[in-house]
């Protein structure tokens, strides 16, 4: 098939590159590839021999690998304080459940977050965000969930949005009011869910793009989470769910019934849960950092996900208690080493499938015409190197919206 080589006014053009477009079912590799963009959108991605001529700026990539900009689709980046002391307790034998029931865990971060101003939350989050940006991340999801009051949850979401005005990154704010029970509602979780559903969700609807909940024995019941998801959808918000991290409550199947973008963690998900997610199109977001940091032993059912065709994404789960990491590249290696993902599965997990987990498949996640020109240019030629290496950042350049 021949292609007409029209002259197009292009703002930017990257040539002499090996492209991993992520289009199709694999890495979408194109040798001697070209990416061209205008007004922040990709207008050509393919072989150099078929590329239209241009009068715009041309950047010779000298054989480097270009992937879509990476996407961290599950983080708790905004928070006050840290929980290094609880980590020390865990090293001495305390369980996550014991720490939480003793007033630690999420509630201890709640206190520090409530005490912090919006400006302080932004300032403390910036180093964590910058570490992810330095690894080629161009889109990040940031959850609330450490305020646990209407005003403090709003403060967290405003802080998350503020980051996008300070750095060149797309931020997807998620409301996670049903993260833990605040002390003032101790013993009356239904009343707190009443607050989440009746007051918080209407208040945050203009700031958040999605709503999440923590479906666990130390969190909220499936019935309570169902109320949260239903209220979110009634306000036009996308939904997702923390599910099956510590126990099998079939939260992932619940998420699927509500048309959730994703269910996340999933170490205790059953075959039926995974099948329900596949049928609903919900993405399985795996979080190897939390698995590693908590010394978990039960693996998420990756083979069942493959068998049923459930899409798999990877994320840092950046948070102060169970995954204090700001390295998505490390998650690539952990996803492969701990969970048995292939190179293709891992890389698609931080690009095309991560975009699906945020409901942004039409915008980002692949290098295709019409999508945002979010790229990561790497000082490697083989995509496997991004998954293989540990403590090594080969990022050459990060491109956000063509710049």
Swiss-Prot record:
Binding site for Zn(2+): 74, 76, 242, 317
GO process annotations (BP): L-histidine catabolic process to glutamate and formamide; L-histidine catabolic process to glutamate and formate
NCBIfam families named in the record: hutI
Matches recorded under HAMAP family: HutI
Protein name, as recorded: Imidazolonepropionase
Superkingdom, taxonomy of origin: Bacteria
Binding site for 4-imidazolone-5-propanoate: 83, 146, 179, 245, 322
EC numbers: 3.5.2.7
Residues that bind N-formimidoyl-L-glutamate: 146, 319, 321
Role description: Catalyzes the hydrolytic cleavage of the carbon-nitrogen bond in imidazolone-5-propanoate to yield N-formimidoyl-L-glutamate. It is the third step in the universal histidine degradation pathway.
Record field: catalytic activity: 4-imidazolone-5-propanoate + H2O = N-formimidoyl-L-glutamate
InterPro entries reported in the protein's UniProt record: Amidohydro-rel, HutI, Metal-dep_hydrolase_composite, Metal_Hydrolase
Disulfide bond entries: none
GO cellular component: cytoplasm
GO MF term set: imidazolonepropionase activity; iron ion binding; zinc ion binding
Predominant cellular place of this UniProt entry's protein: cytoplasm
Gene encoding the protein: hutI
Record's subcellular location: Cytoplasm
Entry keywords, A to Z: Cytoplasm, Histidine metabolism, Hydrolase, Iron, Metal-binding, Zinc
Family: Belongs to the metallo-dependent hydrolases superfamily. HutI family.
CC cofactor note: Binds 1 zinc or iron ion per subunit.
Pfam families attached to this UniProt entry: Amidohydro_1 (PF01979)
Pathway membership, UniProt: Amino-acid degradation; L-histidine degradation into L-glutamate; N-formimidoyl-L-glutamate from L-histidine: step 3/3
């Amino acid at each position: 098939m021949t292609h007409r080589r029209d002259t197009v006014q292009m703002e930017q053009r990257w040539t002499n590159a090996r492209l991993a477009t992520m289009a199709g079912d694999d890495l979408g590799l194109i040798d001697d590839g070209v990416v061209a963009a205008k007004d922040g959108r990709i207008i050509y991605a393919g072989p150099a021999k078929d590329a239209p001529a241009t009068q715009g700026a041309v950047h010779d990539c000298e054989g480097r690998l270009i992937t879509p900009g990476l996407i961290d689709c599950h983080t708790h980046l905004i928070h006050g304080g840290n929980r290094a002391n609880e980590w020390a307790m865990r090293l001495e034998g305390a369980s996550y459940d014991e720490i939480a029931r003793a007033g630690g865990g999420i509630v201890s971060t709640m206190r520090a977050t409530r005490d912090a101003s919006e400006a302080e939350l932004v300032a403390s989050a910036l180093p964590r965000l910058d570490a992810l940006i330095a690894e080629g991340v161009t889109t990040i999801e940031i959850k609330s969930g450490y305020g646990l009051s209407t005003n403090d949850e709003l403060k967290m979401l405003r802080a998350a949005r503020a980051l996008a005005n300070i750095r060149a990154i797309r931020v997807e704010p998620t409301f996670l009011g049903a993260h833990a029970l605040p002390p003032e509602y101790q013993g009356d979780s239904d009343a707190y869910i009443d607050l989440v559903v009746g007051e918080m969700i209407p208040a945050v609807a203009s700031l958040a793009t999605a709503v999440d909940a923590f479906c666990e024995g130390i969190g909220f019941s499936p019935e309570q989470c169902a109320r949260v998801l239903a209220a979110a959808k009634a306000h036009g918000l996308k939904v997702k769910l923390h599910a099956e991290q510590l126990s099998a409550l079939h939260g992932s199947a619940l998420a699927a019934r509500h048309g959730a973008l994703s269910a996340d963690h999933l170490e205790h998900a059953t075959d039926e849960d995974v099948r329900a997610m596949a049928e609903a199109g919900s993405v399985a977001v795996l979080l190897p950092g939390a698995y590693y940091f908590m010394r978990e032993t039960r693996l998420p059912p990756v083979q069942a996900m493959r068998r049923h065709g459930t899409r798999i994404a990877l994320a840092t789960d950046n948070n102060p208690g169970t995954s204090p990491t700001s390295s998505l590249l490390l998650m690539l290696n952990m996803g492969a080493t701990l969970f048995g993902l292939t190179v293709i599965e891992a890389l698609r997990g931080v690009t095309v499938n991560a975009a699906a987990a945020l409901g942004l498949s039409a915008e980002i996640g692949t290098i295709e015409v019409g999508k945002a020109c979010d790229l990561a240019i790497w000082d490697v030629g083989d995509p496997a190197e991004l998954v293989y290496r540990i403590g090594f950042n080969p990022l050459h350049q990060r491109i956000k919206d063509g710049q």
